[in-house]
Amino acid sequence: MAQNEELTAEAVEAEETLTSYTSESTSAEDAPKKERPALTVAGAAVGRRKEAVARVRVVPGSGKWTINGRTLDNYFPNKLHQQDVNEPFKILDLEGAYDVIARIHGGGISGQAGALRLGVARSLNEIDVDNNRATLKKAGYLSRDARVIERKKAGLKKARKAQQYSKR
């Protein structure tokens, strides 16, 4: 019995020690939620990545995606590409608030997904610069990824791959 009292006394003392180091901070639920004005404005932009070019229109709606006349699930069957494309809406808490209409050509699947994400982010930035720009910029969604395939050089098999060289 005495041991239990000692353990509880130690536990209470440890709890008091720990609480002395913590601060009173507001949790995410207590923080006042910033009200966004209801926007009925459409935005349009162009996104590019590698060889892919995406012309994107974002209009107020129910969250429907139309890419070259097909749905998002149909055009990008890979869930990673679907998530990648939808990130600008997630980070701004605007999922389901806008419909996306896009025309994409050139490049491969990954390049097209990157181009579409940039186009969507630029469109959302155009709609409401004051509220959206800082968040999108911090996440890196407004930056064009300038990496492209290096050209093949004469005398080499590929861009950098050369014939094996023997010094002796």
Curated annotation (Swiss-Prot):
Keywords: Ribonucleoprotein, Ribosomal protein. InterPro entries: Ribosomal_Su5_D2-typ_SF, Ribosomal_uS9, Ribosomal_uS9_bac/plastid, Ribosomal_uS9_CS, Ribsml_uS5_D2-typ_fold_subgr. One of its GO terms (molecular function) is RNA binding. Residues 1-29 have a biased composition (Low complexity). The keyword S-adenosyl-L-methionine does not apply. It comes from the Bacteria. GO terms for cellular component: cytoplasm; small ribosomal subunit. NCBIfam families: PRK00132.1 (NF001099). PANTHER family: RIBOSOMAL PROTEIN S9, SMALL RIBOSOMAL SUBUNIT PROTEIN US9M. This is Small ribosomal subunit protein uS9. It comes from Paenarthrobacter aurescens (strain TC1). The gene is rpsI.
